[in-house]
């Protein structure tokens, strides 16, 4: 009996390239022995609903073609199910942080080849209150950039759109007084932003978490303490080289669980989408999701292989 695969794709991602190549992808999967069907999302939340339906239909594999937001929705659809299908990822978004972390090819047919080869690893995901994430959670005005940037601008200039929007928002940066509890430790004070990372790549910064491990059960907690615009600019420059962890205004820790609260409002970002406001409780779910990765790429700096 052939394995069944369900493709969940965002038809607007990647300048609609995947939609045009879908027939070729289906033929390739069928030739490889998979009974494959596809579903196109139309609005936010559709990928979550469809992935839950795919669980009820006992699909062995879900293939996600879209950006980090589409992948996040699929993860939220299957995370609470005891028998979760393996996930194949075809990176079609603007930045594709998760795809970068796993060294997935951006060429559609090469990404399909990775899935067909069948090499997979188990990776951690995070839970924030009642929702899940696979790449990062963050808080602070600057973290609004990813979901405040218009789709038209992203289509026109690609990842550079985030830098344009970020420069526009810099004058609006504010520090917020927070309490952060993590694995028995406590930080209390004013911060500009915090990041909780599961991978090494966030918003296109591939060295933001230079010692990332995708399956060790730990978040990387980055706290940028009260800072002015000049200090923030310096920290961001250092972050492009992975040297921000040495800056005196940066706290860099590993934690399995984190609780953050404040009497002030602080917007949250979950895998590039708006995640509400504080307070928030974060829990790392170790090796919770299984994903396909290139077998010829040594992820020694990222994945702890047995």
UniProtKB/Swiss-Prot annotation:
Single GO molecular-function term?
Answer: ATP binding
Query: Which cofactors, if any, are listed as required?
Result: Mg(2+)
What's one GO-annotated cellular component? plasma membrane
- EC number, as in UniProt: 2.7.1.107
Binding residues annotated for Mg(2+), in chain numbering? 213, 216, 218
Q: Which PANTHER family does this UniProt record tie to the protein?
A: LIPID KINASE YEGS (PTHR12358:SF106), SPHINGOSINE KINASE (PTHR12358)
Q: What does this protein do?
A: Catalyzes the phosphorylation of diacylglycerol (DAG) into phosphatidic acid. Is a key enzyme involved in the production of lipoteichoic acid by reintroducing DAG formed from the breakdown of membrane phospholipids into the phosphatidylglycerol biosynthetic pathway.
Q: How does it assemble?
A: Homodimer.
Where does the chain cross the membrane?
A: none
Query: Sorted alphabetically, which InterPro entries does this protein's record hold?
Result: ATP-NAD_kinase_N, Diacylglycerol/lipid_kinase, Diacylglycerol_kinase_cat_dom, Lipid_Phosphate_FormReg, NAD/diacylglycerol_kinase_sf, YegS/DAGK_C
Q: Return the broad EC class.
A: transferase
Top-rank taxon, per record: Bacteria
Q: Which reaction does it catalyse?
A: a 1,2-diacyl-sn-glycerol + ATP = a 1,2-diacyl-sn-glycero-3-phosphate + ADP + H(+)
Keyword entries, A-Z: ATP-binding, Kinase, Lipid biosynthesis, Lipid metabolism, Magnesium, Metal-binding, Nucleotide-binding, Phospholipid biosynthesis, Phospholipid metabolism, Transferase
Q: Which residues form the DAGKc domain?
A: 1-132
Give the Pfam families listed for this entry. DAGK_cat, YegS_C
Q: What is this protein called?
A: Diacylglycerol kinase
Q: Which family does it belong to?
A: Belongs to the diacylglycerol/lipid kinase family.
Fetch the SMART domains from UniProt: DAGKc (SM00046)
Catalytic residue list: 273
> Does the keyword field hold tRNA-binding?
no
């Amino acid at each position: 009996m052939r394995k069944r695969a369900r493709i969940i794709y965002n038809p607007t991602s990647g300048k609609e390239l995947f939609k045009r190549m879908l027939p070729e992808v289906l033929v390739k999967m069928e030739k490889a022995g998979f009974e494959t069907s596809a579903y196109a999302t139309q609005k936010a939340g559709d990928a979550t609903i469809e992935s839950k339906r795919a669980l009820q239909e006992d699909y062995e594999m879900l293939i996600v073609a879209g950006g980090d937001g589409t992948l996040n929705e699929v993860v939220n659809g299957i995370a609470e199910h005891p028998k979760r299908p393996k996930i194949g990822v075809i990176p079609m978004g603007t930045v594709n942080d998760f795809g970068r972390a796993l060294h997935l090819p951006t060429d559609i047919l090469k990404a399909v080849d990775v899935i067909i080869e069948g090499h997979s690893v188990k990776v951690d995901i995070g839970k924030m209150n009642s929702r899940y994430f696979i790449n990062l959670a963050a808080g602070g005005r600057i973290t609004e950039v990813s979901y405040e940037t218009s789709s038209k601008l992203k289509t026109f200039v690609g990842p550079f759109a985030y830098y344009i929007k970020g420069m526009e928002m810099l004058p609006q940066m504010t520090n917020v007084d927070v309490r952060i509890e993590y694995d028995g430790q406590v930080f209390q004070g004013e911060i500009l932003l915090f990041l909780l990372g599961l991978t090494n790549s966030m918003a296109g910064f591939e060295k933001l978490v230079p010692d990332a491990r995708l399956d060790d059960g730990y978040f990387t907690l980055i706290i940028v303490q009260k800072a002015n615009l000049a200090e923030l600019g310096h920290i961001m420059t250092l972050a492009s080289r992975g040297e921000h962890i040495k800056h005196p205004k940066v706290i860099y820790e590993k934690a399995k669980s984190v609780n953050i609260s404040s009497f002030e409002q602080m917007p949250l970002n979950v895998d590039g989408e708006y995640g509400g406001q504080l307070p928030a409780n974060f829990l790392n779910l170790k090796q919770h999701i299984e994903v396909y990765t290139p077998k010829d790429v040594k992820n020694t700096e990222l994945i702890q292989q047995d």
